[in-house]
């Protein structure tokens, strides 16, 4: 049945995904494709040796992967798995791309079924603060419990909030940036505390999600991405920023137990853990990750500005003072660097470490958002003035 394809490539792909998902449901094996990928991952990794193992995208792009996948059946998997692998490879060019499309299909399908089943109990009230006249922002305590519907640019129909955020994360982080590791952890995107920024239009009763971010509270800090082993290795170069302690004390309105000796000549790991442990009231601390911005490319920079402004205000209104976060978008980095140069004693962002992870010139930064200063900055500078700060520093850096 799997080999009976329609005349067009897209139709073939859609048809394959649909009947494959049906097969998984009938056999009660929803991780079949994941089993194939994990099996291939292990085999290829053993072929290459540990020193050559990158992320999934790198691993499945190697010559070793090309020589094996779709060409040599795995001796440890059922025979029909190899047929599935061959068809998936022919249609999608990569097993990881096929897995991505499968999760998109499942997200939309499951959301549609849930909406139909709970139509009588749906709660569609959208009351939240507004920024720049037309954009609403809020923090949702647990998106898994939210029954409201939202549009995304990745689906024609409205979806439940949790499914909309999962779909946005798949499209943004996995399809665009090839962070395929996230496919096995999509449940993280479907629950818990989240920030959302959205906008209504005249064409639908449901708003469009412009931005979202996952918020992790201090009690879960052991599981924060910020403190994950990958982000605490010696590859991260520490950044020593002037006035760090003064900024932290002013931002938290209380004294910390931090001393200068804990920051000087220390590794980024030591610096970041010292800062976290020094903050006396952990209810005022959180991590914000997976910041997404959706919409047309022409408005991408404006939406990124609004997302930061909305997130800073929302977190401050929720009682937070300090936010641990990881950023790499050049516009964000340049704006914070510019503000730190202009107002070093009122820094909106304390940079703690940096690394060019993919060796492509795009540096990823770790640091701490100080909400008192960040909200002042974003409420002081409109989008045009925000851009002037970014462009000005970019020109300055080019000339040096």
Residue ranges and their predicted role:
Residues 1, 87, 130, 140, ...:
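Extended aliphatic helical segments
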Residues 191-195, 284, 361-367:
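Short beta-strand micro-motifs in enzyme catalytic cores
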Residues 330-400:
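Accessory, usually C-terminal, subdomains that scaffold auxiliary metal cofactors
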